[in-house]
């Protein structure tokens, strides 16, 4: 008997796919389309087990949908720009382009070795000018619409990587890649007006029925829509005002001080003549601007000479510069109510600022001890003059009315989300297609001159971008007036590239950003990736899709219909990482066990949304199962050569039992496939093989039917072996183009059933009975059974409880 030689099988199968262009996809309006997409990888140089799991999930879905008769698009590409390539190029003394392209070639071969059904004719790399030309074109359209703009902004500055970081890229006050302590710095930055779309991005979350609730909640919180009042505090002895936003105007009468950001113009102005304040502001620049960090870091402040007038009581209130106030949120100023806000309370305790209680609990028995903590619940107003006795709702309306009539405030809807800063001060990215002219200001490059090419003949150092030192790149004529001007040297944030790549896959060679194929394929039907992308990539892609829609490039409102967020791959309970020394090289596993085994293990070990714990014995178990599948085919190959058909009237009792088990498992597998519960689909395959092996006298026709069902369920998971056996057993040319099996409901109708017999709830017997028996007939047979009678003779039968074709319980006393 032949043995399972995975390397020969996988090589010959991949050769077949390559020769026949098996995975190439074209538009076909006669079929239902299905666009399956896994998040594109960064070309680091080697695949890790997280990649393997992610892309196996996508491949299983794509193959299953193809076997359902759908026209499936399953592309792959490379998120190729960004700092890691630049840093690696410096380290290895290569150009980022050369390093990236070399990595892409190797990783593509690794993906191929795993048998993924990618349509490589649609491959894109975001560093290719044919790709980034169109995002430059798109940026210019956004600029013309006023959706892209440049302004001075206080940013998170990574002093090691010499670039700006988004708030989300700062972890515990440090750069997410370099680990350096992040500083605050004011520089000119390019932005996209995501705030113009904040309401729509929030409202349309309700349309995302196929998204996990956790991701939707994270986006809702990140957009952070809140209704409140903007309150005007007049600066004493000045015509100026400080505006603050609050969602709790019921606490307005308890304001003890205002807090302003260290970068606030009023703080900077006073710092010119106050060296201690200037030093405090410099110290604040070294602290994190992440909200999570602000919540836990020590609250620090500096009392200024500025005083403001309370808009209702006319009391004089101090203004403090506080390290927990962000310039980017609202006006960069907050009203502080120490009695009713815990952060303000902590600050007030530190600096001996008095508290004023203006809210009491609805529960009159509750004692509020402001010496221990702030009382933050909503309740009834006290110490608030004419507003005393009002609850939150009535106080909100009354204070809004007063402030509006006095021109001291107005109702506002605020968003937590800010405009998206897209400038990066590094070389390896898409050049921003703008030119700076002393006379004309910022001017877009002429569209006929696109793409603005990134120079490749550069010398990289760790001290920022070399673009500013390349005369032939930076020195250009102004497109408006023709005078000497300077090209923009910032490059796009790499999230810019990954926000629209899914759309370019639909028409990768189009001589425009997108063509009509985009509307055939979009939206993506199934998108697979990690939940860590919930509030950056997934939100930016939704924003970009709406921008493209409003540009007339796509018709749909949302990019991704269904989202699957896969769990991490763990080893010894921790995420695999080089720093922990707990990685497993997929290539070693492929060489040792074969790609099908690696794929099968990654699908069987855990449900896709949960973390997968690495297990050597689990891999060996997957390999053992595939050897059993191969051996069953070897032992029964003569049967398949006979071209046998199933005749239901000739089926034996054993055949019917086996078919019941096979079709029950098929039914479960189809249900689990549609729910993306792939581990239980694999379990169904194992049960079917057990059924085929456990019955000694199965008809040949049932063996053929059962094994062909098994191969087709298993094919999306282990495509090489199933393709090979399908051909070897003369079942067809290509299993991928075979219809997925359907359940024979007749096989699920039993002639007999196994009845569990209980007496007073305790198991006493199991009886095989005819399925056509009525409940009364079943009861008669059970009570007449000799074994059962031995337990109930001389006892009174109180009642008989019958669960049809499952269980009967006889209650006696």
Swiss-Prot record:
Belongs to the class-I aminoacyl-tRNA synthetase family. A motif ('KMSKS' region) lies at residues 575-579. The keyword Ligase applies. This is Leucine--tRNA ligase. It comes from Francisella tularensis subsp. novicida (strain U112). GO terms for cellular component: cytosol. The gene is leuS. One of its GO terms (biological process) is leucyl-tRNA aminoacylation. A motif ('HIGH' region) lies at residues 41-51.
